[in-house]
Each structure stands twice: as structure tokens, then as C-alpha cells.
Regions:
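Structural/interface elements that position substrates and couple domains in central-metabolism enzymes
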Residues: 1-208
Length: 208
């Protein structure tokens, strides 16, 4: 964390710390599609673009690592906080959290999901058809409050960095665990172990 803080002090080339800080897998309607298009065009012209062609496989490893961290907790009841591809949007296209959810469903996990932006989109948004037609099985797992997630889950997964989830994490019970994909919680002040993606238990709240 201290090393990353130093890197992010550059204000000339680094227009935003978000470009340098490590995070979870990316998604959305643009970047994955653009990478596939560039890689395809490179193959057509017999060009080697090792950096570009390694990005999507690397992204897949991040998704697999996130799933592994949940599985390692050993709890079958899981609550997901945020599953749009980033905070503040209802866009679910190529969301990496959806891929994690699909794999958990395949493994028989008992899931509930909360995302306030997607809850609204399910009723009136442009993504309504996507939610109802492409992922109806996931839509059925959605709940309307963070309280419902905390009541259900033994493992709570923070899927995007909505500021709301920082406050929710403070209400996690001692017998619950948190897997934080996006560093919503501040590991520097918690003294918690960090292993790849940031994961936290009750110690993250300063408890002993």
C-alpha cells in the first residue's frame, strides 16, 4: 500500500490513481470487445501483440482467483454486494462478478445478491431486457436491501466499490467473513492479511 501511494503521487502522467492501483477483473461493453477486435485484426495480419493478447487471459485469472477466495472460506451461504461491472451503473455486460456468480451457482452455493442500481434497472432501465431474458436465474436471487444480504450470508462478497458497502461492512457479524474484490475496505489501517485480492474478516474492523 505504501509503495502504491508513492507511485500515485505523480500528477503529470498519472491523471488518476485508479490507473495504477491494482484491482479486480474488468468488464463492461467496451474494453473486452475492443481487445478481442484488436487481437483478431493482429492475427489477420500475422502480427504478434503479446501484451494485448495477454490481457484477457490475465483478467480470467483474476476472476478465478476471486472465486477461489470465496471457496476457501468454506461457507455455502454467500451474499454479493454489487454485481454491475463498476459502481454507479446498472450495466451488467461482461461483468466479472456475474461470472463469479455463475460459477458459484454451478457449485451449488446458496446466494443472495444486492445492487441498488441493478434493482432499479430491473424495473425501468435499459438493461431490463438483459436482466429478465439473459440472466433470469440470477435476477431471482436479488434482494432489496443490504440487511437481507447480511441476514443470509456467512461470507459477504464486495463486488464493486460503491461507497455504501464500506458502511455495510461495519455491520458484519463476528461469525461472518468478507471477501473484498475491490479494496473498499482500508487494509492499511486494519492490519489484516492481504493475499492477492484483499480479503478480510472481523479483524478488518479493528476487532480482536
Amino acid at each position: 500500500e505504501q509503495v502504491m501511494h508513492i507511485f500515485c503521487q505523480d500528477k503529470k502522467l498519472n491523471i488518476s490513481p485508479a490507473y495504477l492501483k491494482p484491482g479486480f477483473a474488468f468488464g463492461g461493453s467496451c474494453l473486452p470487445k475492443d481487445l478481442r477486435a484488436l487481437s483478431y485484426q493482429a492475427k489477420l495480419h500475422d502480427l504478434q501483440l503479446p501484451i494485448l493478447t495477454s490481457i484477457l487471459p490475465s483478467n480470467e485469472l483474476q476472476i478465478a482467483r476471486g472465486l477461489q477466495m470465496i471457496v476457501e472460506k468454506g461457507n455455502r451461504k454467500v451474499g454479493i454486494l454489487g454485481f454491475s461491472f463498476k459502481a454507479g451503473t446498472d450495466d451488467l455486460r461482461e461483468s466479472p462478478v456475474i461470472e463469479v456468480i455463475e460459477r458459484l451457482i454451478g457449485k451449488g452455493y446458496d446466494l443472495v445478491i444486492y445492487d441498488k442500481n441493478v434493482n432499479i434497472a430491473r424495473l425501468v432501465g435499459a438493461n431490463r431486457d438483459f436482466i429478465l431474458n439473459r440472466i433470469p436465474h440470477i435476477s431471482k436471487l436479488m434482494v432489496n436491501s443490504t440487511d437481507a444480504v447480511l441476514e443470509h450470508a456467512d461470507t459477504v462478497v464486495i463486488g464493486n466499490n460503491d461507497p455504501e458497502f464500506r458502511e455495510v461492512a461495519k455491520r458484519v457479524r463476528d461469525d461472518q467473513q468478507i471477501v473484498d474484490f475491490v479494496r473498499v475496505l482500508d487494509g492499511r489501517s486494519s492490519g489484516v492479511n492481504q493475499d492477492g485480492l484483499l480479503h478480510k474478516t472481523a479483524a478488518a474492523r479493528g476487532e480482536r
